[in-house]
Swiss-Prot record:
UniProt KW Oxidoreductase keyword: no
Localization terms from the record: Cytoplasm
Family stated for the protein in its record: Belongs to the archaeal NMN adenylyltransferase family.
BP GO annotations: NAD biosynthetic process
GO cellular component: cytoplasm
Top-level taxon: Archaea
Protein name (Swiss-Prot/TrEMBL): Nicotinamide-nucleotide adenylyltransferase
SUPFAM superfamilies the record matches: Nucleotidylyl transferase
Protein's pathway: Cofactor biosynthesis; NAD(+) biosynthesis; NAD(+) from nicotinamide D-ribonucleotide: step 1/1
C-alpha cells in the first residue's frame, strides 16, 4: 500500500523523522507532500518548498532511512473543503491511505473515500516546529537538539535562522 503524509515541515524535525520511520515500517511506499508549497520567507513558513524537501532528504539520509521508497513533492494550500484532496489526487501518484492528524485533512480524506491513519505523536511537546521557530527567533541554539544534525547544518548553511529573525524584525 502507498500512504501519503502531508506536512509543512517548517522545519523538518526529529518528530517528523519518527513518524516517517513508523510509516515506512507499515507501508510499501510513502508520499511526503510538502504543504504550503508556494509560501516562504514568513515567520510561519520561513523555508521554501525546495529547502524543506532537501531538509527531509538530508535527515532521512543521516538516519539511514531508505528513501528509495519515498516520493517527495510540494503542493499549494487550498482552503476550500474538499478541494485540497482533489488537488492532491491531480498531482500525486495514486495512494491508498492518508496519514494526518489535521482535522480538515482527515475530514476531506474520509469524504473522498480514503483510509485515514492517525500517526502517533512522538513527544509532540518537544518536537514541534512552532517551538523550534520560536527558539530560532530567540537566537536560542537549543533548537539544534530537536532536528537532525544534517538539518541543523543545512539551516545554518542557508542562514535560515538568520532569515527568520530578519523577517521578524519590525522597523516601525
Amino acid at each position: 500500500m502507498r500512504a501519503v503524509f502531508p506536512g509543512r515541515f517548517q522545519p523538518f524535525h526529529l518528530g517528523h523523522l519518527a513518524v516517517i520511520e513508523w510509516l515506512l515500517s507499515k507501508y510499501d511506499e510513502l508520499i511526503i507532500v510538502v504543504g504550503s508549497g508556494k509560501d516562504s520567507h514568513t515567520i510561519y513558513n520561513p523555508f521554501t518548498a525546495g529547502e524543506r524537501i532537501l531538509m527531509i532528504k538530508k535527515g532521512l539520509k543521516e538516519f539511514n532511512v531508505d528513501f528509495t521508497r519515498v516520493i517527495f513533492f510540494p503542493i499549494m494550500d487550498s482552503f476550500t473543503s474538499g478541494l485540497w484532496i482533489r488537488n492532491l489526487e491531480l498531482y500525486s501518484p495514486k495512494f491508498d491511505v492518508v496519514v494526518s492528524g489535521n482535522p480538515l485533512v482527515i475530514s476531506d480524506a474520509r469524504e473522498a473515500g480514503y483510509i485515514v491513519d492517525l500517526p502517533p505523536m512522538f513527544n509532540r511537546e518537544m518536537y514541534n516546529a512552532t517551538k523550534i521557530r520560536k527558539l530560532m527567533l530567540e537566537n536560542n541554539e537549543s533548537w539544534s537538539e530537536l532536528v537532525p544534525k544534517s538539518v541543523y547544518s543545512f539551516i545554518k548553511e542557508i542562514k535560515g535562522d538568520e532569515r527568520l529573525r530578519d523577517i521578524a524584525r519590525n522597523d516601525y
